[in-house]
């Protein structure tokens, strides 16, 4: 446990270092702390011994360690003010007509990345918490067709596929009927289970050759089990982390899993400082904010950046963007659920 003065010294060093990225000496703190330079140096030495500060190689000053940033986040972090120009740009960015949910999610991810200079990711509702509420097959030609799936009565998913060579005209209707009878209305986890257990047995009753039918089921439904994730600002990772992190950001399903694991069921927001079990994220900071997607559940907005980021500004920005996102989604779903056709 550190004293109140030591806590104030650590907070000031964090604030000064994130602004200048230069080591902080006792003289720089003397006008801000009502203590002598010797007392401040003594407290800085104690903070260093606790692992909260570390020496710079080229200066007598000190800078926060990863543990120091973590202590600051857990004990002293509060929201900073947002520049009026930043706020204006954010509000302006969300003033657009969205034609689908993905438009809104992508815009939020881009704005968080653009305003911070770091990497941003946004996730839709967790697949396991969604339900299959609609299914249809539209035959496009004698050789190909389009499967149209609906999740939570609002999110469409389309899959174009080649019709198996041994399919007869009625077989697409049979496949559609199996889905309607056995999978429609079920949550995604149940759909996954039935595709592995029940559906193969049912397919045997209707089809002589079953392998390609089961392959087709897998092809059509595999998208249900993938996270919907948008990542912006990947290239920035080369500056604040390195090649391993940059390459990891392309593995979007693994990234989505790491983001979900950073936040417990009860938490609405979290700041993870160099504390991820994923090696590619072990030396970066991961800020995650949970936001409501009306009628469907919660999505996640995340910022990935360096341990020495400006936490007050970053947390304030992710909160503001999260709030603007919630308002935009509320209006979007209100429009979807309204009778917007007018008869004159």
Swiss-Prot record:
It comes from the Bacteria. Belongs to the HrcA family. It comes from Streptococcus equi subsp. equi (strain 4047). The keyword Repressor applies. This is Heat-inducible transcription repressor HrcA. GO terms for molecular function: DNA binding. InterPro entries: GAF-like_dom_sf, HrcA, HrcA_C, WH-like_DNA-bd_sf, WH_DNA-bd_sf, WHTH_HrcA_DNA-bd, WHTH_transcript_rep_HrcA_IDD. PANTHER family: HEAT-INDUCIBLE TRANSCRIPTION REPRESSOR HRCA (PTHR34824:SF1). Negative regulator of class I heat shock genes (grpE-dnaK-dnaJ and groELS operons). Prevents heat-shock induction of these operons. GO terms for biological process: negative regulation of DNA-templated transcription. Keywords: Repressor, Stress response, Transcription, Transcription regulation.
